[in-house]
Amino acid sequence: MIIPFHKKFISFFQIVLVVLLLCRSINCDSRHVFIRTELSFIKNNVPCIRDMFFIYKRELYNICLDDLKGEEDETHIYVQKKVKDSWITLNDLFKETDLTGRPHIFAYVDVEEIIILLCEDEEFSNRKKDMTCHRFYSNDGKEYNNSEITISDYILKDKLLSSYVSLPLKIENREYFLICGVSPYKFKDDNKKDDILCMASHDKGETWGTKIVIKYDNYKLGVQYFFLRPYISKNDLSFHFYVGDNINNVKNVNFIECTHEKDLEFVCSNRDFLKDNKVLQDVSTLNDEYIVSYGNDNNFAECYIFFNNENSILIKPEKYGNTTAGCYGGTFVKIDENRTLFIYSSSQGIYNIHTIYYANYE
């Protein structure tokens, strides 16, 4: 069942009533309903080439990477906060480091604090034994304490890393931050079974020496893997990554679920979210049910949000001014078990935000 919404101002309760009555009338198989409420626009004067959104103390933040090449050829990593209909820049973290080039960014958000790591980015084949990182700590989202740390790279020496925002993962009553990587490609089986690995910190990112073993038997030879990101929800671990001939020719987008086997070991297997003529964008959960976003493979003026693989919303991005609207980089930002934001860039400097509510009907 596809439920299209194109109006900007519809009350939450009106939508709930319509959806519940509709589902009753057609005898929906699923007992779960999700709906989209008001659409809002946010403007950004900074040309971000990468956005990393998160919720902290009930407010929306963005880590913006500005690395456009120009006369100055400078890199900026801004921490921004949503204030009304704009992103307000609070801090430029990169200028407080001695790093060169575009770094890896790993952000960890807990109830009371934000911890952001900026780590030097070298090609995995040229990576040094140790990796220099700057650890930024904040308990208000505005001011950040900076300390330089060194991470021994023996665990992830041959792994390709990608930037992401994550929650802590609790294993046997201890919380860990994870940095995870994937073998970018293999031409022959080396029987190591370490194609995906994570190193972990139990002291909020100050030291990194714990190895998390990820057992994944569906790694294929002769293809490239990239953009690996862990998903942590209610202490369940999953991964999202891309598979293709090369980074510009994506053949598939994989999502794998992991089960804690013993100690610091997990067993992971594929979860099939692939749909014909649709490109998987992002995955999250609401009340233990998956919510998945897709772009239209042939027309990014449309994107879809599926809940429980049954009900879906069709989103046609609304124009802001005279710009051409699209649905690019769709990302879920979970508020709680009943609400999530769906954020995408509709045009340069313009972000569309949809609020999605979870509801039950009897």
Swiss-Prot record:
Record-level GO BP terms: symbiont entry into host
Location in the cell: Secreted; Cytoplasmic vesicle, Secretory vesicle, Microneme lumen; Cell membrane; Host cell membrane
Primary localization: secreted
Kindly state which keywords UniProt assigns to this record, in alphabetical order. Cell membrane, Cytoplasmic vesicle, Disulfide bond, Glycoprotein, Host cell membrane, Host membrane, Membrane, Secreted, Signal
From the record, give the cysteines joined by S-S bonds. Answer: C48-C64, C119-C133, C180-C198, C258-C268, C303-C327
Report what the Swiss-Prot or TrEMBL entry states about this protein's PTMs.
N-glycosylated.
Membrane topology recorded in Swiss-Prot or TrEMBL? Peripheral membrane protein
Protein name (record): Cysteine-rich protective antigen
**Species name:** Plasmodium falciparum (isolate 3D7)
Give the encoding gene's name: CyRPA
